[in-house]
Amino acid sequence: MSFLNVFSSRPTPKQVAKDRLKVILIHDRGELSDEVLDKIRLEILDVLSKYVEIENEDVDITVTKSNPIEGESPSLVANIPIKNIKGKAR
């Protein structure tokens, strides 16, 4: 059965928990408060809404650690699905 799991596209609960813990630790180390992250999220959505239609509920913005040559640094990662591009001729 474990052989078939190699081809599964769904992450295991263990992997999901591990990823969530990483995000929490990185968030803490990045020294960004929840208020700051919320402000960043709202400003990003405000700017993007001028150009594209998005579902606010589907937006995922997190702080992660990148791994550049000189060491790790926090990175802001945004997953924002676009429904439609405004002003696009149909």
Swiss-Prot record:
Alphabetical UniProt keywords: Cell cycle, Cell division
Keyword Flavoprotein: no
GO BP annotations, alphabetical order: cell division; regulation of division septum assembly
Matches recorded under HAMAP family: MinE
Task performed by this protein: Prevents the cell division inhibition by proteins MinC and MinD at internal division sites while permitting inhibition at polar sites. This ensures cell division at the proper site by restricting the formation of a division septum at the midpoint of the long axis of the cell.
Family statement: Belongs to the MinE family.
NCBIfam families: minE
Record-given protein name: Cell division topological specificity factor
